[in-house]
């Protein structure tokens, strides 16, 4: 509804400040410039956030759905879950903007071993999809970095073909 949209749009300055503050901290830690990447907000119902690297016609940006991160929605994310979401997307930024050691490039995919390695550096939950409370759990990154993805809903790439998910929940 338009009332909710207006309330959520009024929150964007707060979210922007929260995200930039976190990304500036991570940038200092890693020598990167993620806090300078444009941040946009929308009303996506099927994704919480995204990082677009900026190839071809795509502009580099972070994008977050106010329907998930907003304070005035029915079931807002906790601060810990919001921070984990922001780190999740920053880990995608890291994949494109820093050298990943070869030993962490064995598993292809958007949430493959390189992304998991980036998660391990910043304390993001190495889970491809949002799960409430994942950001609070102490993750065994060594184990996660060596484990193949077994979730059949995640696209996997092999040398001969591309397998896409057949069902989405």
Stretch-by-stretch model annotation:
Residues 104-144:
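Post-HExxH zinc-binding segment in Zn-dependent metallohydrolases
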Residues 79-94:
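Short alpha-helix carrying the canonical HExxH Zn2+-binding catalytic motif
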Residues 46-79, 97:
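Active-site scaffold of zinc-dependent metalloenzymes
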Residues 90-111:
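Catalytic Zn2+-binding segment of zinc metalloproteases
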Residues 1-10, 89, 95:
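A short, surface-exposed helix-loop junction/capping segment
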Residues 137-159:
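Long, well-structured alpha-helical subdomains associated
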Residues 8-58, 128:
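Auxiliary, metal-adjacent structural segments of Zn-dependent hydrolase domains
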Residues 159-169:
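Conserved small/polar residues in nucleotide/adenosyl-binding loops
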């Amino acid at each position: 509804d338009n009332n909710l949209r207006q309330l959520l749009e009024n929150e964007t300055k707060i979210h922007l400040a929260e995200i930039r503050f976190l990304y500036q901290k991570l940038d200092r830690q890693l020598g990167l410039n993620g806090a300078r990447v444009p941040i946009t907000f929308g009303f996506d119902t099927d994704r919480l956030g995204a990082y677009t690297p900026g190839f071809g016609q795509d502009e580099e940006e972070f994008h977050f759905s106010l329907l998930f991160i907003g304070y005035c929605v029915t079931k807002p994310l906790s601060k810990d879950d919001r921070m984990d979401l922001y780190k999740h997307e920053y880990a995608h930024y890291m994949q494109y903007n820093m050298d990943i050691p070869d030993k962490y490039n064995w598993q292809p995919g958007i949430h493959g071993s390189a992304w998991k390695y980036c998660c391990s550096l910043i304390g993001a939950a190495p889970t491809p999809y949002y799960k409430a409370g994942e950001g609070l759990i102490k993750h065994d990154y060594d184990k996660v970095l060596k484990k193949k993805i077994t979730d059949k809903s995640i696209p996997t790439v092999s040398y001969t073909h591309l397998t896409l998910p057949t069902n989405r929940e």
